[in-house]
Regions:
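Phosphate-binding/catalytic loop of phosphoryl-transfer enzymes
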Residues: 2-73, 80-81
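Short helix-capping/linker segments at secondary-structure and domain boundaries
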Residues: 28-34, 74-86, 173-175, 228-238
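Conserved ATP-utilizing enzyme core subdomain
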Residues: 56-165, 169, 177, 246-268
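Non-transmembrane, aqueous-exposed alpha-helical and coiled segments at domain scale
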Residues: 105, 156, 160, 171, ...
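Glycine-rich phosphate-binding/hydrolytic loop that grips phosphoryl groups
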Residues: 162, 209-260
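Glycine-rich phosphate-binding loops at beta-strand->alpha-helix junctions
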Residues: 177-199
């Protein structure tokens, strides 16, 4: 078993994230500049340039984490309208679809210094917490007339969708992207996907399914790939993506009952081809 995949990257000066850039760089390698977008709790992109160009990867900001907070609050504030065990996320974007974007709130949220920081960079739920959202709402309420215009849960959800779409769109525009391939739970939110398409226009947004990786399975493919690379003595991190000074073989191996016998290090991998057979095995990619 291989585990602890981030530590060696951090020891080399990297952020330990986003490790998905390794998969993205092999998967989307080609003549055009494309971006892999993953929307989990945090949204991140990997910019895969033309041959010879460095790979750039970083977290753009909140993905679903703040939306989940608002959806949970909406559920808990109206229990009669939500059955017991209702999920703490915006199912099919229905909450955001019922709201309107608050015009004052995005500017307050975007005052967080992380957005203006240069990549490589990474963030997480420890920054984009409920407290971050509540502080922005409190600041909005302090504006003239703000206390009388407190946004409803649906309006906050719609505004957070706009925040994610705007920050992702700005990042892709900055890097001259010609196509975006999206994965992660956020790609199952039709309201968020529509907002992303509008923010990215005229750059097309495709689902990762179209290129062989189910939107909900990308992390499984990534873990399988990183494990295979480490097993064969190959680096699993791109310095330009995480900030690491040098490429590093990732993780530590825990042997079973017998001694651990590692294979001879393999030749470098340059591309990744997803086959139907590998998809059926839930993430055993074919590398070339």
């Amino acid at each position: 078993m291989v585990s602890d995949l981030r530590s060696r990257d951090i020891a080399a000066g990297g952020h330990g994230a986003p490790l998905a850039s390794t998969l993205d760089a092999l998967w989307l390698a080609g003549p055009n500049r494309r971006a892999a977008l993953n929307i989990g709790g945090i949204a991140n992109i990997t910019v895969v340039g033309r041959p010879g160009e460095p790979v750039i990867a970083y977290d753009t900001g909140p993905g679903n984490c703040l939306l989940d907070t608002v959806a949970t609050r909406a559920r808990d504030s109206a229990p009669r309208h939500h059955p017991a065990g209702a999920p703490g996320y915006d199912v099919d974007g229905t909450l955001a679809a019922a709201g309107q974007v608050d015009l004052a709130l995005p500017g307050i949220l975007l005052a967080e210094p992380y957005y203006a920081a240069e990549p490589p960079k990474s963030t997480g739920r420890e920054l984009f917490t409920a407290g971050y959202l509540d502080a922005a709402l409190a600041e909005r309420a302090s504006h003239p007339g703000g206390a009388e215009l407190i946004p409803a849960h649906a309006d906050i959800a719609a505004t957070l969708v706009e925040l994610t779409a705007r920050t992702v769109g700005a990042a892709c525009t900055r890097h001259g992207i010609t196509e975006v391939v999206g994965a992660g739970g956020g790609m199952r939110n039709p309201v968020l996907v529509a907002a992303l398409r509008a923010a990215l226009d005229p750059v097309p947004l495709r689902r990762s399914d179209e290129l062989g990786i189910p939107v909900d399975a990308k992390e499984a493919y990534l873990t399988a790939l990183l494990g295979a690379l480490s097993w064969h003595g190959l680096p699993g991190v791109l310095p330009g993506a995480t900030g690491s000074r040098t490429p590093r073989v990732l993780g530590r191996f825990s042997p079973g009952h017998g001694p651990l016998r590692m294979p001879t290090p393999a030749s470098p991998v340059h591309t990744l081809r997803i086959t139907e057979a590998s998809a059926a095995r839930l993430g055993t990619p074919c590398t070339t």
